[in-house]
Swiss-Prot record:
InterPro entries: MraZ, MraZ_C, MraZ_dom, MraZ_N, MraZ_sf, SpoVT-AbrB_dom, SpoVT-AbrB_sf
Lineage of the organism: Bacteria, Bacillati, Bacillota, Clostridia, Eubacteriales
Location of the SpoVT-AbrB domain: 5-47, 76-119
Keywords: Cytoplasm, DNA-binding, Repeat, Transcription, Transcription regulation
Superkingdom of the source species: Bacteria
Gene encoding the protein: mraZ
Family designation: Belongs to the MraZ family.
GO MF annotation list: DNA-binding transcription factor activity; transcription cis-regulatory region binding
UniProt protein name: Transcriptional regulator MraZ
CC annotations in GO: cytoplasm; nucleoid
Cellular compartments annotated: Cytoplasm, Nucleoid
Length: 142
């Protein structure tokens, strides 16, 4: 399970240094892809396989299912960390997430989300009503 918030930066070669705690759980090789809300999702190889198997069951006749699978898989790539724990974020994902230099990685249960520091700050300053969300989660039995 991934938890916590980590602030760091890309180096001059667009590599991020994965924080040690996240690296321990992600492993030396993991998958990143376009996430929702303008961030990048990172999954362990095992978790990616589980997600892939679930998405394979979506009906090809459903337009929304096809669109989501295209979106999700078109941005996916495997990241292999070097001995210093650095991994390359491809240009297309940097552009998608608005990442220039400063990034925030957050643990969110089975995935890590990688945000530009600016987008993460804006997200946290938005008018999200967490009390209302908590009520809705309660209605779902959570």
């Amino acid at each position: 399970m991934f938890i916590g918030e980590y602030q760091h930066s890309l180096d001059s070669k667009n590599r991020m240094i994965v924080p040690v705690k996240l690296r321990e759980d992600l492993g030396e090789k993991f998958v990143i892809t376009k996430g929702l809300d303008g961030c990048i999702y990172a999954y362990t190889i095992n978790e990616w396989g589980i997600l892939e198997n679930k998405l394979k069951t979506l009906p090809l006749t459903n337009r929304d299912a096809r669109a989501f699978v295209r979106f999700f898989f078109s941005g996916a790539c495997i990241v292999e960390l070097d001995k210093q724990g650095r991994g390359l974020i491809p240009q297309n994902l940097k552009e998608y997430a608005g990442i220039e230099k400063d990034i925030v990685s957050i643990g969110v249960l089975s995935r890590v989300e990688i945000w530009s520091r600016e987008k993460w700050s804006n997200y946290n300053e938005s008018d999200i009503d967490y009390d209302l969300i908590a009520e809705k989660m309660n209605d779902l039995g959570i």
